[in-house]
């Protein structure tokens, strides 16, 4: 990159940009380039610096970034984050999680978060993903992706670090050198310091070729993702569960993609390769009444009645939680779900004749359904209506004294049905998204 070389244009001219500014070479060049564009200044240019508190120089780095932004008349957001040392994901990953959360909190709706990843970073990412056996991961970093309320933009992926260094020297820029970038305990540093220089000795264009491979992999992934998006809806029931017979009609490679797409669509953590293997080996061929399960990252995939369900386990409801509910306003449940009455003619909800008790199941409850004279165990009734076992524990019971009037909105006793029909109302139970994704 030279002073006169063209800088990648923002995909949507006129949209404000927030630059992730660490004070290092890459982000300094990116912020300076954008600040040199009068039109971008008019439409909005700000920076954000993350103070991780992990390095003894963190305060000095923050001061450096503040001085740079003051000199160039750029508003700077300083986000001090707490990085957990006991998250179970490693310090580097925990710092990345905290950093992304700060970015998401600051980025405004529709705005762009600009990151200074360059061609060399892309090559390192491609090698790391290849060494980890990640097929879709070979697409590495995308130039533009949705992020939080806006978009994540990487305008420097076609520029090498050498070009950025030339630019910085021509502009007489000062930047921070982070000593942790020389720590060989980190895989990325090892690749940058030892592996890539050897590749360049033999193949001078190695970095550009690896980055081009990432772009080709991204194009192929986009095609496959589009196919997955067409196929997946036909495999889902109204609750979002995956039909096993429909899934197994596809070959194994496509099944793996559909399982991952299903998890991603539901907002679940990425499904690891181990999970795909366990699902293929244990869940898909299990018996009809099997309760087979795969657990990862506080998330479960359970098999039940020829369906696969995504589920996030929740703690049991407090045993003393037994509020009285009038029905005039929604009742928020301990797991974040709710009970409410819905008017079928859009009139004001009148509420019950007297407040009713709401509580969790304790076991052994029985219910008399409309048209029947004898009570039946809730366990059997819930099985009959197809409620998965793990969801039953979070179903609220609506009681009038000792009489059970409703179990969620799946089972209603005759007196409640009569009253609801007379008042043109429906009882609705909305379970929380974290309970069943």
From Swiss-Prot:
UniProt record similarity statement: Belongs to the tRNA(Ile)-lysidine synthase family.
Purpose of the protein: Ligates lysine onto the cytidine present at position 34 of the AUA codon-specific tRNA(Ile) that contains the anticodon CAU, in an ATP-dependent manner. Cytidine is converted to lysidine, thus changing the amino acid specificity of the tRNA from methionine to isoleucine.
Top EC class, one word: ligase
Protein name per UniProt: tRNA(Ile)-lysidine synthase
Listed GO MF terms: ATP binding; tRNA(Ile)-lysidine synthase activity
Principal location class: cytoplasm
Subcellular location: Cytoplasm
UniProt cross-references to PANTHER family, sorted A to Z: TRNA(ILE)-LYSIDINE SYNTHASE-RELATED
Binding site for ATP: 22-27
Written domain comment of the UniProt record: The N-terminal region contains the highly conserved SGGXDS motif, predicted to be a P-loop motif involved in ATP binding.
Keyword set, alphabetical order: ATP-binding, Cytoplasm, Ligase, Nucleotide-binding, tRNA processing
């Amino acid at each position: 990159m030279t002073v006169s070389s063209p800088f990648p244009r923002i995909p949507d001219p006129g949209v404000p940009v927030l630059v992730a500014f660490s004070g290092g070479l890459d982000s300094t060049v990116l912020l300076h380039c954008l600040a040199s564009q009068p039109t971008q200044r008019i439409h909005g240019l700000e920076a954000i610096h993350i103070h991780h508190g992990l390095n003894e120089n963190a305060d000095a780095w923050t001061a450096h970034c503040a001085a740079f932004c003051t000199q160039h008349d750029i508003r700077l957001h300083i986000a001090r984050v707490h990085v957990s040392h006991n998250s179970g994901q490693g310090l580097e990953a925990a710092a990345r999680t905290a950093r992304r959360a700060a970015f998401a909190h600051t980025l405004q709706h529709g705005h762009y978060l600009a990151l200074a990843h360059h061609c060399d970073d892309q090559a390192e990412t491609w090698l790391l993903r290849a060494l980890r056996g990640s097929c879709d991961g070979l697409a590495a970093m995308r130039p533009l992706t949705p992020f939080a309320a806006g978009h994540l933009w990487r305008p420097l992926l076609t520029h090498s670090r050498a070009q950025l260094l030339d630019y910085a020297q021509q502009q007489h820029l000062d930047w921070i050198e982070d000593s942790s970038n020389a720590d060989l305990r980190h895989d990325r540093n090892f690749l940058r310091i030892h592996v890539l220089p050897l590749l360049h000795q033999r193949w001078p264009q190695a970095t550009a070729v690896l980055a081009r491979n990432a772009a080709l992999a991204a194009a192929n992934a986009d095609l496959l993702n589009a196919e997955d998006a067409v196929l997946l809806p036909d495999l889902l029931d109204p609750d979002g569960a995956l039909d096993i017979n429909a899934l197994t009609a596809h070959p194994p490679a496509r099944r793996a993609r559909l399982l991952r797409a299903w998890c991603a669509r539901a907002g679940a953590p990425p499904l690891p390769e181990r999970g795909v293997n366990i699902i293929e080996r244990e869940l898909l061929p299990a018996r009809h009444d099997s309760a087979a399960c795969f657990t990862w990252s506080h998330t479960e995939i359970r098999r039940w009645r020829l369906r696969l369900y995504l589920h996030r386990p929740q703690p049991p409801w407090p045993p003393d939680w037994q509020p009285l509910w009038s029905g005039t306003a929604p009742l928020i449940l301990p797991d974040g779900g709710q009970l409410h009455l819905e008017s079928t003619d859009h009139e004001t909800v009148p509420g019950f004749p007297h407040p009713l008790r709401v509580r969790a199941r304790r076991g052994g409850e029985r219910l008399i359904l409309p048209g029947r004279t004898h009570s039946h165990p809730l366990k059997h009734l819930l099985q009959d209506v197809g409620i998965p076992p793990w969801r039953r524990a979070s179903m609220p019971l609506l009681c009038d004294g000792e009489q059970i009037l409703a179990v969620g909105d799946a089972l209603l006793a005759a007196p409640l049905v009569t009253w609801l029909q007379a008042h043109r109302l429906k009882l609705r139970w909305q379970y929380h998204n974290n309970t069943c994704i």
